[in-house]
């Protein structure tokens, strides 16, 4: 059996799913740590927390001072990987609190989460995938009404593994008001944008609509029923693009989302 079809979890027992509705970030973080402490002692069950947060900025361990809001907006510093991001209404947040199979492979675990979200977005009709060196789910640069849009992230991933147990997880922009990202450098990436399912599909896509599919895909990916496949997006390099592309390419920092 290949690693792509093996379970990423230590336990063969089913994953428990908790729907927490809208919950403050610190309260959800406390719940994560409570569950993680149990799993580290081989107690309780692997659990997928699904929720929305009120608007909040959270900063991972690699956040630089220049990535933070310039207007003094409060930021919660957290112990996950990655940099700063925004959470808020219209964004599905998932925290799989999972004891990982040994030997622990954090990169493989992140690829499982990406695969689940790529599968959901693809089934909705969105062309998306991975970008080498950048976690999450991305859309390729594309031409929209004569204007080139940069690569843009529809789902972010940031995790921490402690005592063999994964915490934190992913966020999928459904019908979020994306202006929350304007005050920061999302994930510390300056040459790309942020988007949502609703923006890309041209219709309202709610958290409630996608939650069942995301739940099923995450469980399947972690259990090896949804194999990890190569799914990199096509990169547009404007230096080597056609004359037509080069002429139409805007300065990426001027492209606004939200």
Swiss-Prot record:
Residues engaged in binding substrate: 80-87, 156-158, 169-171
Matches recorded under Gene3D superfamilies: Bira Bifunctional Protein, Domain 2
Keywords noted in UniProt: Acyltransferase, Cytoplasm, Transferase
Catalysis: reaction(s): octanoyl-[ACP] + L-lysyl-[protein] = N(6)-octanoyl-L-lysyl-[protein] + holo-[ACP] + H(+)
Signal peptide range: none
Site (Lowers pKa of active site Cys): 153
Family: Belongs to the LipB family.
Leftover remarks: In the reaction, the free carboxyl group of octanoic acid is attached via an amide linkage to the epsilon-amino group of a specific lysine residue of lipoyl domains of lipoate-dependent enzymes.
Protein name: Octanoyltransferase
């Amino acid at each position: 059996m290949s690693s792509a079809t093996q379970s990423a979890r230590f336990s063969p027992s089913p994953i428990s799913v908790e729907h927490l509705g809208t919950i403050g970030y610190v309260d959800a973080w406390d719940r994560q740590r409570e569950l993680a402490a149990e799993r580290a002692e081989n107690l309780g069950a692997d659990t997928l927390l699904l929720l929305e947060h009120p608007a909040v900025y959270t900063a991972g361990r690699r956040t630089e001072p220049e990535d933070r809001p310039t207007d003094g907006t409060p930021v919660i510093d957290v112990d996950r990987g990655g940099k700063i991001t925004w959470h808020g209404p219209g964004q599905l947040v998932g925290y799989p609190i999972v004891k990982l199979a040994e030997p622990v492979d954090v990169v493989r675990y992140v690829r499982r989460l990406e695969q689940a979200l790529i599968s959901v977005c693809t089934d909705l009709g969105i062309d998306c995938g991975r970008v080498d060196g950048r976690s999450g789910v991305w859309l390729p640069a594309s031409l929209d009404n004569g204007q080139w849009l940069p690569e843009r992230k529809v789902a972010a991933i940031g995790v921490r593994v402690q005592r063999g147990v994964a915490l934190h997880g992913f966020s999928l922009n459904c019908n979020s008001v994306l202006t929350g990202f304007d005050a920061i450098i999302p994930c510390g990436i300056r040459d790309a944008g942020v988007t949502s399912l609703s923006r890309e599909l041209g219709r309202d896509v709610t958290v409630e609509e996608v939650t069942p599919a995301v739940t099923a895909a995450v469980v399947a990916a972690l259990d090896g029923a949804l194999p990890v496949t190569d799914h990199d997006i096509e990169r547009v390099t404007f230096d080597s693009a056609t004359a037509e592309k080069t002429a139409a390419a805007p300065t990426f920092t001027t492209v606004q989302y939200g």
